[in-house]
Curated annotation (Swiss-Prot):
Listed name of the protein: RNA polymerase-associated protein RapA
Taxonomy, superkingdom: Bacteria
UniProt xrefs under SMART domains: DEXDc, HELICc
Motif residue range(s): DEAH box: 280-283
Amino acid sequence: MPFTLGQRWISDTESELGLGTVVAVDARTVTLLFPSTGENRLYARSDSPVTRVMFNPGDTITSHDGWQMQVEEVKEENGLLTYIGTRLDTEESGVALREVFLDSKLVFSKPQDRLFAGQIDRMDRFALRYRARKYSSEQFRMPYSGLRGQRTSLIPHQLNIAHDVGRRHAPRVLLADEVGLGKTIEAGMILHQQLLSGAAERVLIIVPETLQHQWLVEMLRRFNLRFALFDDERYAEAQHDAYNPFDTEQLVICSLDFARRSKQRLEHLCEAEWDLLVVDEAHHLVWSEDAPSREYQAIEQLAEHVPGVLLLTATPEQLGMESHFARLRLLDPNRFHDFAQFVEEQKNYRPVADAVAMLLAGNKLSNDELNMLGEMIGEQDIEPLLQAANSDSEDAQSARQELVSMLMDRHGTSRVLFRNTRNGVKGFPKRELHTIKLPLPTQYQTAIKVSGIMGARKSAEDRARDMLYPERIYQEFEGDNATWWNFDPRVEWLMGYLTSHRSQKVLVICAKAATALQLEQVLREREGIRAAVFHEGMSIIERDRAAAWFAEEDTGAQVLLCSEIGSEGRNFQFASHMVMFDLPFNPDLLEQRIGRLDRIGQAHDIQIHVPYLEKTAQSVLVRWYHEGLDAFEHTCPTGRTIYDSVYNDLINYLASPDQTEGFDDLIKNCREQHEALKAQLEQGRDRLLEIHSNGGEKAQALAESIEEQDDDTNLIAFAMNLFDIIGINQDDRGDNMIVLTPSDHMLVPDFPGLSEDGITITFDREVALAREDAQFITWEHPLIRNGLDLILSGDTGSSTISLLKNKALPVGTLLVELIYVVEAQAPKQLQLNRFLPPTPVRMLLDKNGNNLAAQVEFETFNRQLNAVNRHTGSKLVNAVQQDVHAILQLGEAQIEKSARALIDAARNEADEKLSAELSRLEALRAVNPNIRDDELTAIESNRQQIMESLDQAGWRLDALRLIVVTHQ
């Protein structure tokens, strides 16, 4: 290999060193200085892993002074090159630049430059890059993008709401599903879609203080969204880093109390430019026209500043009309400004609901009914649709569905309010109560008597709380180490129950973490029962491990012992047996406990076991919950209302459980209230709203489409290939789970999402739902998205060379495989990828420019090729460089036609869809005031910007592979 002092070469194995200069040559060795790093390398002359850097006419080069030049001519003299061309800064022509003065920091980014500079990738990396481009483009085009990656069951009504709301510009909606139907999941799905598509980047979630950790866990575990929890301490810390502490994080959770307590803090929240605000338990925001509460005013102030708002609340019937109006007023104060007018409007929706019911019943419609439908929809062109709906043809059902959609679009608050009920959603289990009455031990009787004497001055509420937990009273006098479990009959009963139901997974819930820990020790030491503990003192990772151990079928824990707070936000649908070791203080907490098992998708009826001690507050509460509210065996939407109305009486009975006079009357009174309120709620059900929120067949089809996508084997093959190339170790753990750990040879030192200890993953949704320690891998998981970014944002796999053993072709025949990318640049929030994601166009050219890509499929062709080592590859490239240049020019001439076709198709699709959506909403605006002006303005503005961006779309060469035919 001829070396001359001053020549520029690049290292094949250490390209990061930049351009090297030959500074010494002797008979056997050559020394290169790499000025950008100041390092020297000594190579053997005969077989050195370096490539001569030679630019060609048309290339742009940079001098060591920083100016650039377009090369027009290359001269060689005594082995040294001089480039002649035009300077780009001064436009001076005929400028000469000797190669010794080239910029040493040169990085070859174009695939052809990397190939000619000897920066040749492994063949499998080229294949991975092409697949990454192909799959990435396909995923952006999926109609349900953003709905597949969450660790949740595919529940149609949840998917329907998320699909509808998640695609809107700055959605402002009220989610008012009944308890247990998954409002939190719906909100998470909407957030996930908006964040993934770029429609939103900054999100604020405001919740009651007790639910902060539940939301934190739920967002992370189900949606891979890592929120920061802001409290007083975190807020104070962040003040050192930014003028507005909330600017330090993109995703924030804080409590309502934290938000409203300080005027400055609320101002900072309002100024933080959030894209989405989520408020949980919004029904607790007290409002009246004359005196709105401070909490309501705080949220109102925020809602004025934040474009998108999701309010999670109890059902409208539970709230009452005025309270319901107050929530809607937060979403759109211009639309909902007059309560009396709102009440009148609601009455007028009855005929619409009747019309929808009529269509869904499938009966033939009379002429009067057809005319009424025509008037309600108010459009001239629906006559054919009405006729089709009333015919016996195959199209009748779809015509009826379309008419139902039109009616719901035009009437009611269906664009801003979503509400599902258990009656309208299938898939809930039965709940069966088993009460176990147990004698009150003498030790407790004594402790209670002494406590009564010593605590005579305590309030009735404090005495009532004490009486719910007699073991705590006993420990107050005997010390924290007192062994109450040795004589408490509930412990004996629990051990007996567990030993006789060894094959059952049992969830045991008690109020205090200390109780859970003591029970675990007793079960382990006395009966060898495997019990996991779950309480608020544990970290999220520790809780995950406990939950995973409980979920293991054969070797896992039989029992999970949970404290009240520790179990918030966790669901254990694989178990159907629950033991309440004690009872919570109010009906909301009781429903929350049962809700750990009573979820959609629960396969078995739920067995609720309540061992209680007679003559204690537990015996009072168990009767009140069961006989007064029917709260164990059915959800109890009336519970809180009745609890508040009888609070004082109930507290007195709990504080003095031996005073039972009048208690039967209280229970009877509560039961009557419960039945009356229930009937009232049923009467007030908005059938029209339920039909819209539920989604019907459309929602079912959406769930089935995603389920089909879950079975896509392409993801598994691609992910394994990706992990191999990044350098991630994979260890099959069985049960459809894989453990990933970093290796010593990673493509990047710290791969986002992969901890030093490794992570457990699964591609199976069912496994992910049962095992909280296993991350659910989909195309939307950060691990895959980060992997795609790592490959596609750099030059991994962008240039390679392969051998094709084919005796039907002459030895030395050249083929060049080109991967172009057609793309447009636009702000992320425009979601341009819906129409034109970066799209690969593959060409396989021979030396005459014939494109063989259509005849030769990529994967089949890839399997026929053999790899070449980098050194041999560099020699081959140098030998055929001129031919490759010629083929590249033929490729450039051909790509324009293919790229233009893609861009035109994207323009037509964008124009058609966005114009249709705008026209639809403008037409609806005339009959349904729930369509906001800012939504129409945003769609029109987005349409214009998207069309402009598509007009500027272009293409570039992303990767190339040189193929040389051989017969050996």
